[in-house]
Amino acid sequence: MDIVAHIQGDPGSSLTPLILIHAISGLALPYFALRPLSTDSDDGDSDKSRPVYGLSSPIFESVSAFRRHGKSLPSLALEYVRIIRREIQPRGPYLLGGWSMGGMLAIEMAAIFVAQGETVKHVVMIDSLNPEVYPPFQDSQEHQVLSTIMYNAIAWRVEGLEEACMPTLSDDASTTTSSDNSRASTDHGADSEVESEADLDDFMQQLREHVHQGMRMLASYHTLHRHIYLPDTAVTLIKCTMLGNLSPLLRASRKVFAKKNLLDPHNGWRTEQFRSFRSVPFASTHDACFDAEASEELTTILRGVLKDID
């Protein structure tokens, strides 16, 4: 899987590319669910079709590279700044965004770009929490439980997200073995089937590790005593207004935090951190942002945010 994916738009357009960072799954694939984000892209003028790129985690190319750079949100963000300069856009101004942890990483990356003398026009966060307020784990068991809950929530969606890139994935991929995922209806031979199943097992293991390490990065962020200030960057938070089902395995304090955050239109961010900060309500649960029933509204909101940005 390539780290950088061209999602939509004309790479030759004069409009600033929108670079979307993966969520805790490490996958940029959900962004392919978005409709065209350029409102004038259908009039035949390719220059008005903003290029949109998605950034996936390096874990799917090199586990060792992820382990080297994925020790904290700032260290991972620094590696992503290097990747963007090398493979997408060597110089600013930049336009960044991301869903959930992707928005947190986008803010970290914006701070790094600015420290390097670049301009970051805007950061668009899709229901991203300020990691400063994320509660630390009480113990290793809570880390494991939360990581498993998160992994399972992602794994059952993987079939729809990965169908263009991966062999068939079972809906219950988090619990089946490779033998359970046999593709009896394919035209490939047995060797190909075994190889595909091995690739799938590796992929799901990488996904599990990424979620586990991502949760650790969030829960330990407070220990960095990091407070980002971007006085020249505008920020939009697309805020989910619906609370999904809370797992009975969650501790009571986690459930209280989730309910409290739902009522906070800023998701813990402080408006004085940025040149401007706008919160736009989005009628979706956090996990369903890119599901079919929500992606059209999300596209409309993103179009509105982007329409006045060159």
Swiss-Prot record:
Question: Per the record, where are the segments of Low complexity compositional bias?
Answer: 170-184
Q: One GO cellular component from the entry? A: membrane
Instruction: Please identify the protein, giving its name as recorded.
Output: Thioesterase pytI
Instruction: Say what happens when this gene is deleted.
Output: Impairs the production of pyranterreones.
- Which GO MF terms are attached to this record? hydrolase activity
Q: Which family does it belong to?
A: Belongs to the AMT4 thioesterase family.
What species does this protein belong to?
A: Aspergillus terreus
* Biological role: Thioesterase; part of the gene cluster that mediates the biosynthesis of pyranterreones, a family of antioxidative compounds. The first step of pyranonigrins biosynthesis is performed by the hybrid PKS-NRPS synthetase pytA that condenses 4 malonyl-CoA units ato the acetyl starter unit by the modular PKS of pytA. The acyl chain is then connected to an L-serine through the amide bond by the modular NRPS of pytA. A tetramic acid is formed and released from the PKS-NRPS pytA to give pyranterreone 5 with the help of the thioesterase pytI.
